[in-house]
Regions:
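Cysteine-nucleophile amide-bond enzymes
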Residues: 1-194
Length: 194
């Protein structure tokens, strides 16, 4: 989906954990997860929704990007975390939503997947061509402003030669730079300049 959605970020992936982490959380033997044990043991620790549908991915695939905003849900109880992880695995195999429409339930796109499983994160929604959707850039911008249930942890920017860990101000500047002023989504447009 990174080529279909405008802006700085074109995708969102969910880290669900390693075998050790899933065991510690008490969900390793859940039926929704058991069938993916081999894939997890081979390094699949992310779930994402892209043109292949909802599937597991390794870090090498999920993090193959020029920029990554690392966000983490805040305030989830251990029980709610277990429910969410299990629910993400339950969605594996769901087809991709090429219309990017939050109102469809038989298919999903990346940020819609996050919203389906974690509605308490309060992701910003907008209407585009009559459809409700969630832009990854607005998800990041709203998080920087404290308007979602996510905590901002770090922003990593990279090119072919090097990578660097940057902060909130750099992320805000890159989000603004990705959108011409008249076309900026509301959460990006209202971010203060450095």
């Amino acid at each position: 989906s990174g080529h279909a959605i405008p802006g700085h970020f074109g995708h969102a992936a969910i880290y669900v954990g390693t075998e050790r982490q899933l065991r510690q959380a008490g969900v390793w033997d859940a039926p929704e997860i058991r069938k993916y044990h081999d894939a997890i043991r081979k390094g699949a620790m992310f779930i994402e929704a892209d043109n292949k549908g909802v599937h597991l991915s390794t870090a090498a695939l999920a993090l193959d990007a020029d920029a990554i905003a690392h966000l983490r849900p805040k305030g989830l109880s251990p029980k709610r975390k277990r429910q969410a992880v299990t629910e993400f695995f339950r969605r594996v195999g769901m087809p991709f939503d090429y219309y990017f429409d939050l109102d469809t339930t038989a298919c999903t796109f990346c940020t819609e997947l996050v919203n389906m499983v974690l509605p308490e994160m309060r992701l910003p929604q907008r209407r585009v061509y009559g459809r409700r959707l969630i832009l990854p850039d607005e998800m990041a911008a709203a998080t920087l402003k404290g308007r979602t249930g996510f905590a901002f942890l770090r922003y990593v920017s990279a090119n072919r030669d090097h990578w660097q860990v940057l902060g909130r101000q750099a992320l805000a500047a890159d989000l603004r730079a990705a959108w011409p002023a008249p076309q900026r989504p509301p959460h990006v447009a209202t971010m203060a300049s450095r």
